[in-house]
């Protein structure tokens, strides 16, 4: 049984309708819908959404994710870039999070599409956060995205080292994800960000080790949330346990002590949870800490 502290919250109904209409009108996908995020109506009720580019079919099959798996066979809808910008204009967004499915069928993993979106959004005055796949570990693809000028470069490690083969697609890797984050900083990303889930069988010590690994990769922002099974499919893992609010608070204390500039840790925290607030907190702490 899901405990009471893992409770879903509603948002402003009128804003929810406005977001849904804008997305439908412009044919834009969101990870909120595709990944069945538990915060969807709360975030939409605040007029925010995380846009998903490069279609809605992922070439990978991670066991925590509800996004559809398949082979897009190299298809890219370049009109998606302009439609996304129009949806952002219509919704009046100033902080935009852009993510994508994994596209192992593309030579650059979709990096050039990310870059095109970032440049367009910067032209209309948006602060942009990208949440990228691992691009097969390609430094060139990471550089393509970073060079386009995102304000935050995010890539999720998802889980601890030991559980990575169980939780993520076989083409993903713990060290590869750390490398992607390191490359981003080396290529000049102003802020980097990562996230992981609890409740998959990890120990407290393994969580701390993962946070230490992320800091060694010079990651600035981290999000920690509870894994919630997105469907009844046997492909999706069952939660081993539900971490308590006290455990999340303790882990946040550890993360802050390790030097992260901003930390979100709680049962319903997801990668893009309160993204703008975390961005501002990180900037403030960079200035404060010199």
From Swiss-Prot:
| UniProt signal peptide | none
Task: Give the Gene Ontology MF terms in alphabetical order.
Answer: 4 iron, 4 sulfur cluster binding; lipoate synthase activity; metal ion binding
The Gene Ontology CC terms held by the record are: cytoplasm
Major site of localization recorded for this protein? cytoplasm
Q: Which reaction does it catalyse?
A: [[Fe-S] cluster scaffold protein carrying a second [4Fe-4S](2+) cluster] + N(6)-octanoyl-L-lysyl-[protein] + 2 oxidized [2Fe-2S]-[ferredoxin] + 2 S-adenosyl-L-methionine + 4 H(+) = [[Fe-S] cluster scaffold protein] + N(6)-[(R)-dihydrolipoyl]-L-lysyl-[protein] + 4 Fe(3+) + 2 hydrogen sulfide + 2 5'-deoxyadenosine + 2 L-methionine + 2 reduced [2Fe-2S]-[ferredoxin]
Note the CDD domains from the entry: Radical_SAM (cd01335)
What is the top-level taxon of the source organism?
Archaea
Radical SAM core domain boundaries = 44-261
- Answer whether the UniProt record assigns the keyword Transferase to this protein: yes
* Cofactors named for this entry: [4Fe-4S] cluster
EC number(s) from the headed UniProt entry: 2.8.1.8
Binding residues for [4Fe-4S] cluster 1:
32, 37, 43, 272
Q: In which pathway does it act?
A: Protein modification; protein lipoylation via endogenous pathway; protein N(6)-(lipoyl)lysine from octanoyl-[acyl-carrier-protein]: step 2/2
Q: Where is [4Fe-4S] cluster 2 annotated to bind?
A: 58, 62, 65
Provide the cofactor note recorded for this chain's UniProt entry: Binds 2 [4Fe-4S] clusters per subunit. One cluster is coordinated with 3 cysteines and an exchangeable S-adenosyl-L-methionine.
Locations listed in the record: Cytoplasm
Q: Which UniProt keywords apply?
A: 4Fe-4S, Cytoplasm, Iron, Iron-sulfur, Metal-binding, S-adenosyl-L-methionine, Transferase
Cross-referenced InterPro entries, in alphabetical order?
Aldolase_TIM, Elp3/MiaA/NifB-like_rSAM, Lipoyl_synth, rSAM
Q: Which family does it belong to?
A: Belongs to the radical SAM superfamily. Lipoyl synthase family.
UniProt name for this protein: Lipoyl synthase
Query: Which organism's genome codes for this protein?
Result: Pyrobaculum aerophilum (strain ATCC 51768 / DSM 7523 / JCM 9630 / CIP 104966 / NBRC 100827 / IM2)
